[in-house]
Swiss-Prot record:
The lineage of its organism: Eukaryota, Viridiplantae, Streptophyta, Embryophyta, Tracheophyta. Residues 177-186 have a biased composition (Low complexity). Its main location: nucleus. Pfam families: AP2. The gene is ERF2. The keyword S-adenosyl-L-methionine does not apply. The keyword Protein biosynthesis does not apply. Induction: Induced by ethephon (ethylene-releasing compound) in buds and to a lower extent in leaves. Strongly induced by cycloheximide and mechanical stimuli. Wounding leads to a both local and systemic expression, independently of ethylene, and through a de-novo-protein-synthesis-independent regulation. Wound induction is reduced by methyl-jasmonate. Induction by purified xylanase from Trichoderma viride (TvX) and another elicitor from Phytophthora infestans (PiE), that appears to be mediated by both protein kinases and protein phosphatases. Residues 164-203 are annotated as: Disordered. This is Ethylene-responsive transcription factor 2. Residues 98-156 bind DNA.
Length: 233
């Protein structure tokens, strides 16, 4: 059972215990004539007798260590280069300009033609030219002569410049045939009889050539509706 601790301690015990307590805790505010202080003193005395050692409550100065400011870690973000603009170089197919009254021949030359309103829109051959511009200019000159200021032209700003006529492409002349050379020789050095025969042969040759030219012109002059346009393909 719990036995109350006697609060009455002899002066000798108090005087012998005080050095121990004062060495541990320093000066204790305990008074001998105070009953409550004596109760506390009795508890401490019993504890020391039982082998209890008070904690070392001596205040120790703690040196404040300098605080290291830790910067937040930055994760390097790889810079992504903007995608290079892919220029799709598309092959530009050059398209020839379309000119009024001009069409391209299969072998690359350009033919100029015009329709004559006085002949119900019959096509009139103007010639073959090296470039489409020359053929278009030939058409402009013919159209201006036919219709005047009402003509629809390819180069209206050039009609009053008095430019020379575009140069036509002519077929290569054939080499003289043996018959023609013989006719010429007979006309110069032959007898009168041979000369008469040579003259007759020359007339026949000229007649054949004229018929051939007439057939060629007839093939070129075909009927077309009035207002139709010929364009370079």
């Amino acid at each position: 059972m719990y036995q109350p601790i006697s609060t009455e301690l002899p002066p000798t015990s108090f005087s012998s215990l005080m050095p121990c307590l004062t060495d541990t805790w320093g000066d204790l505010p305990l008074k001998v004539d105070d009953s409550e202080d004596m109760v506390i003193y009795g508890l401490l005395s019993d504890a020391l007798t039982a082998g209890w050692t008070p904690f070392n409550l001596t205040s120790t100065e703690i040196k404040a260590e300098p605080r290291e400011e830790i910067e937040p870690a930055t994760i390097p973000v790889p810079s992504v280069a903007p995608p290079a603009e892919t220029t799709t170089a598309q092959a530009v197919v050059p398209k020839g300009r379309h000119y009024r009254g001009v069409r391209q021949r299969p072998w690359g030359k350009f033919a100029a033609e015009i329709r004559d309103p006085a002949k119900n829109g019959a096509r009139v051959w103007l010639g073959t030219y090296e470039t489409a511009e020359e053929a278009a200019l030939a058409y402009d000159k013919a159209a201006y002569r036919m219709r005047g200021s009402k003509a629809l032209l390819n180069f209206p700003h050039r009609i009053g410049l008095n430019e020379p006529e575009p140069v036509r492409l002519t077929a290569k002349r054939r080499s003289p045939e043996p018959a023609s050379s013989s006719i010429s020789s007979a006309l110069e050095n032959g007898s009168p009889k041979r000369r008469r025969k040579a003259v007759a042969a020359k007339k026949a040759e000229l007649e054949v050539q004229s018929r051939s030219n007439a057939m060629q012109v007839g093939c070129q002059m075909e009927q077309f509706p009035v207002g139709e346009q010929l364009l370079v393909s």
